[in-house]
Amino acid sequence: MTKKKAYKPGSATIAQNKRARHEYSIEEEFEAGLVLQGWEVKSLRAGKANLSDSYVTFMNGEAYLFGATITPLNVASSHVVCDPIRTRKLLLNKREMDSLFGRVSRDGYTVVALSMYWKNAWSKVKIGVAKGKKDHDKRDDIKEREWKLDKARIMKNANR
């Protein structure tokens, strides 16, 4: 007998880091679990997360997420002292951890958080190995995106 999928109201995406895709070229993506406290889970369910300026560092053979803000709910966090920008441990396989650490130890590479989402009942973070873009690369991306929009507009008007 197959297992029923849990009903998820709305989107499974909690937060996205759109700036990371603009400022970095993403080479490879990984999915990581998060070690959270109870009030953080309730805040994530309410969509109170922000991933801008968040990145991953490695200490003592473990990965930690820095700079991610989870705003506490007044109802859920009245009896605990909440730190919205605390460092959160990431759950990765040993092979993934070694791969990420090897890439980051090279020059110019960093690991940034791209998005946070629900996978069944678990909150996950999509992290990416990234290399910083130069200004001219950013301008080229903007030109390419605008040309795609113009091309779609021209094709739409040509079909009429």
UniProtKB/Swiss-Prot annotation:
GO terms for cellular component: cytosol. CDD domains: SmpB. Disulfide bonds: none annotated. It comes from the Bacteria. Transmembrane segments: none annotated. One of its GO terms (biological process) is trans-translation. The keyword Transmembrane does not apply. PROSITE patterns: SSRP. GO terms for molecular function: RNA binding. It is found in: Cytoplasm. Keywords: Cytoplasm, RNA-binding. InterPro entries: SmpB, SsrA-bd_prot, SsrA-bd_prot_CS. HAMAP family: SmpB. Required for rescue of stalled ribosomes mediated by trans-translation. Binds to transfer-messenger RNA (tmRNA), required for stable association of tmRNA with ribosomes. tmRNA and SmpB together mimic tRNA shape, replacing the anticodon stem-loop with SmpB. tmRNA is encoded by the ssrA gene; the 2 termini fold to resemble tRNA(Ala) and it encodes a 'tag peptide', a short internal open reading frame. During trans-translation Ala-aminoacylated tmRNA acts like a tRNA, entering the A-site of stalled ribosomes, displacing the stalled mRNA. This is SsrA-binding protein. It comes from Pectobacterium atrosepticum (strain SCRI 1043 / ATCC BAA-672) (Erwinia carotovora subsp. atroseptica).
